[in-house]
A protein has these predicted regions:
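Eukaryotic scaffold repeat domains enriched in small/polar residues
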Residues: 22-391
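Bacterial N-terminal signal peptides
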Residues: 6-16
Length: 391
């Protein structure tokens, strides 16, 4: 064990991680999870359904935040086979703009999927008449180092990132001046957020192909990245995450890869304080990243949401486990692309609770599903508990 630790230290301190194995060579195993069929209970008013459920975050096994891009009016009469979500009647929730109603955008459910809070006071904030391009909430997270457990929201309608009090009563902070832009005061379609122990916030700024950093008070600190496919360049950075030693992982979706960075005072790259230390190629559409103290999990789709809406997905989403050097450890696929239990068109965001249940948001079919470990599942094939745990 001591010898392995010494080798790892040398690799990291040299500024580059070991080259990962080819992702396509990774064996695809059987999912170690069972779906909880019908977990998320409908609560919309009569004639309405869940909309594009783009985001999920489990604060605890009994308190799970969900965000959707508005609800949808159901056809009248409702087609046979409706199971409480639009995908069950062949409607793509993320593109059915004509039936969208901006209500119940953020809500909270318990461990059995029952709605316990609806933050309707903020619905108007995210309203959009756009029928093309992004709108509404893209992802939600809680900073694990924040004892107040504020809910952070990537708002693509207003091109801002917001922090709400945990009970939803107060808007605590907003990053970005509002409206799309490319200077240090603006985002162009923020997609994700990640955090450091000192309260720093990283934001993936999709339209500007960059990562922006802010301090705990929301002041701009720095930025890096331009559109491209070179080292430290991005094409639609969809996910950003940090691990327990402060490394920064970026799901570079348009370039089909994950890039890894660290903060340093000895960077020889063009940025004086940020250094690219690894590129992990071989993905198709890395949409979300979950880093623990031991490994990194990545959700990899065969299509993004627009392509999935056009029926261009060629395989179900895949969960990929890598070690800290980017070496593939294990992977398994979601049950299918359909609307059956455990299936989904797109795995957009996922979250893991302290009991190692995981939750997956599918904005195309318009539902969030809960999965629990199969009896006897190996810890090598399942998610570790959040590390660091929420304060």
């Amino acid at each position: 064990m001591r010898r392995a630790l010494m080798i790892f230290t040398v690799i990291v301190s040299s500024g580059l991680l070991a080259a990962p194995a080819v992702m396509q060579d990774m064996p695809v195993g059987v999912s170690p999870y069972d779906v909880v069929d019908g977990w998320l209970k409908p609560f919309a008013s009569s004639g309405h359904s869940f909309g594009g459920t783009s985001a999920v975050f489990a604060e605890s096994p009994d308190r799970i935040f969900i965000a959707q891009r508005g609800e949808h009016r159901l056809p009248d009469p409702v087609p046979p086979g409706f199971q409480g979500f639009l995908g069950s009647i062949g409607v793509r929730a993320n593109t059915a703009f004509e039936s969208r109603v901006w209500q119940n955008v953020i809500f909270v459910v318990d461990g059995d999927g029952n709605m316990i809070e609806a933050w309707t006071q903020w619905d108007d904030m995210f309203q959009s008449d756009a029928e093309e391009g992004p709108s509404g909430i893209h992802k939600i997270k809680i900073n694990p180092f924040d004892s107040d457990r504020k809910l952070w929201v990537a708002d693509t309608t207003n091109h801002q990132v917001h922090a709400f009090s945990n009970d939803g009563e107060e808007l605590v902070m907003s990053l970005g001046a509002g409206g799309a832009g490319d200077d240090n005061d603006h985002f162009d379609t923020p997609w994700d957020m990640a955090f450091l122990a000192d309260g720093s916030i990283f934001v993936s700024d999709r339209g500007n192909s960059r990562i922006m950093k802010f301090d705990a008070e929301g002041n701009f600190v720095t930025t890096w990245g331009v559109n491209g496919s070179g080292r430290g360049e991005f094409d639609r950075p969809h996910a950003v995450a940090t691990d327990s030693i402060g490394r920064i992982y970026v799901g570079d979706m348009g370039n089909n890869r994950v890039q890894v960075f660290n903060e340093t005072t000895r960077s020889v790259w063009y940025h004086p304080n940020i250094s690219p230390i690894a590129t992990w190629p071989g993905f198709e559409r890395p949409t979300d990243i979950y880093a623990t103290g031991y490994d990194v999990w990545i959700s990899d789709n065969s299509a993004d949401t627009a392509e999935a809406a056009a029926g261009d997905a060629t395989r179900p989403a895949r969960m990929v486990k890598l070690d800290w050097n980017g070496n593939p450890q294990f992977s398994w696929e979601i049950a299918g692309l359909g609307t059956g239990a455990g299936e989904m068109a797109v795995l957009h965001q996922f979250s893991v609770d302290v009991e190692k249940n995981f939750y997956a948001a599918d904005p195309m079919h318009g539902r969030v599903q809960k999965f629990i470990q199969k009896e006897g599942a190996s810890f090598m094939e399942t998610f570790g508990a959040p590390d660091p745990p929420l304060q």
